Regions:
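Interdomain motor-coupling "hinge/lid" segment immediately C-terminal to the ATP-binding subdomain
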Residues: 129-251
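Accessory nucleic acid-recognition modules appended to NTPase machines
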Residues: 201-376
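Hydrophobic positions on the alpha1 helix immediately C-terminal to the Walker A/P-loop
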Residues: 36, 40
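Structural recognition of the conserved hydrophobic beta-strand(s) that form the central parallel beta-sheet
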Residues: 92, 117-123, 145
Length: 446
């Protein structure tokens, strides 16, 4: 089964853009970066030529001899015995972290040969760049972050009719109950597989839950091997400990990251490098607290208070040893972690949409906490997340009374509605946040 990925549309827009720069594609392992590059190349270019610096280490010598992009093109074409024609060929530089000279060459392609289309990517690129003290040609490349398959992409593959219905909406009003129930069902299935392509395909091809679990476990095992292969020896046990503490961190009523959950007596200074490694690898999202929702929101970040979420809700479920049946048919004692899964899934949906304005969270001097706060244009918007239809709790009200935002949001399993500044949205539709904000600003802007 083919899953249509939205990143292909980003690539298509880049292909014909003026002042185009080479793309440097970032993202966690096993999210489909190579597939996306190759699919785009095959569908949108006459020729697609891939260079893999891990499997073809001899390629490094080509880049070590010259920095002239025109000469590089000639030698690469000879090496691969394929034509490289400006405007007709996509060049893919895969596993580019294995060749620093190839990474640096992107600068010269940008400056001296922008007519060539190049997309570069690598495994654990952020980790490798830091470890080897490599220089990324900032300003000379277009950096794109790729994420796991979103629920939006999942729904298109699993229930295209419901997807098209949501796409056709032009106003915020109650959805028919049949549509809402379909969304709830598919969303719970998505929380089982998460967005890792192998797991999604196993689920949607009806290969059985055992195959989904096997796919997720294989990825978790690969991540464990990455710790040993790419991290500094002294950091390996710390990275391992943080990663395996995520279910416990998120099971707490207060999901703030607590070092003593990792190990009694653990201190921040001992684990900061390990946290950074996981962030650089794209395996976790760190969401910081803010002292107040001011503009720009980044100015109010409190670096000593943060929550840590997994890059993918399916991996988080498997890491927690949570049976798939508990997610699709919740049981009584599935409570705190249900909330954690709901938050992780919503965060996963909005991450690709907030651009460089990363999400934060807010706490009052008392006990109120708003799960996420984002800067959207000239607004600071609080986002509350509820796992089901029970929306009791006063945190969003406390925030509203304190700061009086124009708009506030609640993602739950309730129906779509906008009332007096409160946008209530089914959590499955968080991935359409840009659509809802456009409607809100056009219709309800104060």
């Amino acid at each position: 089964m083919r899953i249509e990925r939205e990143i292909i549309n980003q690539f298509k827009a880049w292909k014909d853009a003026p002042n185009r720069k080479p793309i440097l594609l970032k993202g966690a392992r096993q999210i489909g970066k190579t597939w996306a590059m190759e699919t785009f190349g095959k569908e949108c270019f006459k020729y697609c030529v891939k260079f893999d610096f891990d499997r073809q280490p001899e390629l490094k010598s080509v880049f070590q001899v010259t920095k002239d992009p025109k000469r590089l093109v000639k030698e690469l074409a000879l090496y691969q015995d394929q034509p490289i024609i400006a405007g007709e060929t996509l060049m893919i530089f895969d596993e580019i972290q294995e060749c620093e000279e190839a990474l640096n060459s992107l600068k010269y392609f940008c400056e001296e040969a922008p007519e060539y289309h190049i997309i570069a990517a690598g495994s654990l690129l952020g980790v490798a760049v830091k470890k080897r003290k490599m220089t990324v040609p900032v300003g000379k490349v277009k950096i794109i972050d790729m994420y796991p398959i979103s629920f939006k992409e999942f729904l298109l593959a699993s229930d295209a009719r419901t997807y098209e219905y949501i796409e056709s909406l032009e106003e915020i009003s109650h959805l028919p109950e049949i549509v809402l129930n379909k969304l709830r069902t598919e969303y719970r299935r998505y929380q089982v597989s998460g967005g890792m392509p192998e797991a999604v395909v196993a689920l949607l091809d009806n290969q059985g839950i055992s195959e989904v679990e096997s796919a997720l476990q294989d990825i978790l095992d690969l991540y464990e091997l990455d710790f040993s292969k790419y991290a500094e020896p002294r950091e390996i046990p710390r990275i391992h400990a943080i990663w395996h503490s995520l279910p416990a961190q998120l099971s707490k009523e207060n999901r703030k990251f607590i070092y003593k959950v990792i190990k009694t007596g653990a201190r921040s200074k001992d684990y900061e490098d390990a946290l950074m490694w996981l962030e650089d690898a794209g395996m976790i999202y760190r969401v910081y607290n803010i002292s107040k929702p001011g503009m720009p929101i980044s100015a109010y970040e409190e670096t000593d208070a943060f929550k840590v979420y997994a890059c993918d809700c399916g991996l988080l479920r498997r890491l927690a040893h949570l049976p798939a049946t508990v997610v699709t048919d919740p049981i009584a004692n599935y409570t705190e972690f249900k909330g954690a899964m709901a938050e992780n899934a919503v965060l996963q949906s909005i991450m690709p949409l907030v651009d460089n304005q990363k999400p934060y969270y807010w706490t009052s001097p008392g006990t109120a906490e708003v799960e996420f706060v984002i800067q959207w244009g000239d607004e600071i918007i609080p986002i509350e997340v509820k796992a089901e239809e029970n929306i009791s709790g006063s945190s969003l009200s406390v925030y509203f009374k304190t700061y009086a935002p124009h708009h506030r949001m609640r993602f739950s399993m309730l129906n779509l509605q906008y009332n007096e500044g409160l946008f209530s949205c089914p959590a499955p539709l968080a991935g359409w946040l840009d659509k809802w904000m456009s409607i809100i600003n056009n219709v309800y802007r104060i």
